[in-house]
């Protein structure tokens, strides 16, 4: 093996941390992802910086917390001026490429204000979150009475039409729908159809299609590149709609499902924000056993298909000799409740939502000692970008980056983790739950602090906090946020959260070292303060202020 030349950054959408066999799932076997874990390090305590697609991804792509980059929800633009993965890596001689989804919304107003044309190189990169896209496809081509969810063109839809799938929106009508007994479209948006096979050839469904694009790049483009590359291979699945083509649609019946994690005690005097989410349409749907069983079977089938495609990809990397020069990362942007805690989707901070898988394969000989190991250190998604910077031969710019490089953990099994606690944020101001609670947008915010024992959630808007003891209650069933016996614990948690909140990285244009180097330099540029007489300082510091006056304008 050799030092990594390239980086393959694989992100799945809505993949839970515990739905891999290497993470202990008893029925869902993922041998290809397990194989990568056997060659690298599997991190068991990786947390995203927001449990919603857009905000989480913007944190991964900038290496910054949501409060710092500001793109707090899907469709909220990442402001012009935020450095992204591409900005950091390109200046080190590494290209930053994209295949798949980013959920990035360009700051069109900011670009207009600065006179940046969208079709210029810099304008295109600002619009694509700093990546040079090979293919950008965000994978949600939904249409309703008010129009399209995403107004971009879909490369995947173009592919399906070229393959003969006849529809205005083949993404829905074939890849994400089945056929009912009368020959009608059975939409994957309806949970009752999750047991049906999607009406598409398996090889034409989204995950194999994107995998083929990656292999095409590896075969046709990568070998001739003069510069090393980081390619973000970003899959839409196993994100909803919950429907999958044959043979995956009926692989996982109820006997293979993990028991739902929920308890009636969670609904006794519950926190009002928690109630708002359990009582929404998604939470109510996933209380039903038939809904959970149908959706979970399809979800597991989608993950099995993902693993099979990882096998295809890894086999190609190995056969082409590129495996030994490519760092490979597998992770997700958030999880999926799947009925746990009386919830569906993601959004809140229980483990199924905010904790994600993270597997890193580092081909460097320096990582040989950690191959096949498990790391329980608290890490965050924002740690990936500083890791990539170091792999590219640079030093992370810590005035901007708020994560820590994982290379010490990848290359030294005895190193402890970089942090005492992790942080995640959630801005729910755009959701109906904020309206139900009567919360103004500025107050519709949640902050999670999770340390070795406690998970603490602060809610703006005058709400009480939430608190879970992960030692005695690892399933997070008992909220101690209003229990007087835990007042001291809550105070200690607030101290940790405040220690994070008062140190945002907003001074991004000057490094710490530049500030250190400037100490005292103003005196040598003529700013002479704190001096009474000339003999108190070096004569050269007053040289420009001495000599005969050329004119006299006084009396």
Where are these regions (language model features)?
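A contiguous, mid-protein "functional segment" used to position or interact
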Residues: 484-523
């Amino acid at each position: 093996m050799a030092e990594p030349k390239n980086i393959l950054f694989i992100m799945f959408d809505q993949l839970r941390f515990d739905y891999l066999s290497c993470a202990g799932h008893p029925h869902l076997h993922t041998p290809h992802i397990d194989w990568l874990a056997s060659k690298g390090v599997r991190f068991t305590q990786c947390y995203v910086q927001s449990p919603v697609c857009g905000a989480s991804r913007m944190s991964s792509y900038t290496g910054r917390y949501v409060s710092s980059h500001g793109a707090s929800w899907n469709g909220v633009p990442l402001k012009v001026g935020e450095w992204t993965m591409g900005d950091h890596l390109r200046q080190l001689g590494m290209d930053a490429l994209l295949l798949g989804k980013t959920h990035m919304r360009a700051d069109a107003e900011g670009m207009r204000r600065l006179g940046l044309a969208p079709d210029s190189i810099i304008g295109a990169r600002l619009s694509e979150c700093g990546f040079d896209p090979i293919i950008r496809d965000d994978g949600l081509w939904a249409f309703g009475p008010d129009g399209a969810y995403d107004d971009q063109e879909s490369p995947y839809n173009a592919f399906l039409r070229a393959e003969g799938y006849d529809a205005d929106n083949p993404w829905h009508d074939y890849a994400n729908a089945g056929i009912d007994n009368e020959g009608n479209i059975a939409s994957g948006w309806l949970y009752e159809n999750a047991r049906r096979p999607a009406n598409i050839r398996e090889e034409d469904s989204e995950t194999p299609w994107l995998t083929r694009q990656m292999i095409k790049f590896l075969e046709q483009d990568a070998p001739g590149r003069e510069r090393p590359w980081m390619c973000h291979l970003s899959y839409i699945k196993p994100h909803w709609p919950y429907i999958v083509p044959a043979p995956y649609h009926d692989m996982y019946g109820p006997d293979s499902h993990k028991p739902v994690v929920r308890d009636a005690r969670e609904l006794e005097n519950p926190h009002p924000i928690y109630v708002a989410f359990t009582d929404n349409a998604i939470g109510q749907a996933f209380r039903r056993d038939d809904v959970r069983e149908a959706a979970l079977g399809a979800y597991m089938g989608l993950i099995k298909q993902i693993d099979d495609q990882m096998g295809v990809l890894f086999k190609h990397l190995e056969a082409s000799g590129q495996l030994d020069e490519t760092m490979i990362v597998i992770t997700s942007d958030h999880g999926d409740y799947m009925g746990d805690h009386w919830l569906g989707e993601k959004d809140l901070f229980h483990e199924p939502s905010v904790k994600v898988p993270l597997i890193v394969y580092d081909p460097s000989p320096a990582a040989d000692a950690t191959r096949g190991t498990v790391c329980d250190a608290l890490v965050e998604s924002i740690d990936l970008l500083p890791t990539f910077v170091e792999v590219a031969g640079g030093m992370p710019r810590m005035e901007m980056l708020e994560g820590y490089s994982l290379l010490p953990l990848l290359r030294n099994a005895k190193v402890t983790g970089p942090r005492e606690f992790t942080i995640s944020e959630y801005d729910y101001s755009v959701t109906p739950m904020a309206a139900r609670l009567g919360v103004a947008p500025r107050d519709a915010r949640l902050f999670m602090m999770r340390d070795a024992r406690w998970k603490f959630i602060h809610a703006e808007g005058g709400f009480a906090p939430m608190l879970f003891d992960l030692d005695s209650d690892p399933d997070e069933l008992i909220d101690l946020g209003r229990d007087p016996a835990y007042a001291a614990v809550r105070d200690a948690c607030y101290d940790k959260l405040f220690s994070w909140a008062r140190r945002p990285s907003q001074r991004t244009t000057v490094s710490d070292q530049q500030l250190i180097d400037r100490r005292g330099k103003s005196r040598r540029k003529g700013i002479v303060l704190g001096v009474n007489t000339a003999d108190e300082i070096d004569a050269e510091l007053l040289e420009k202020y001495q000599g005969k006056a050329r004119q006299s304008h006084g009396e």
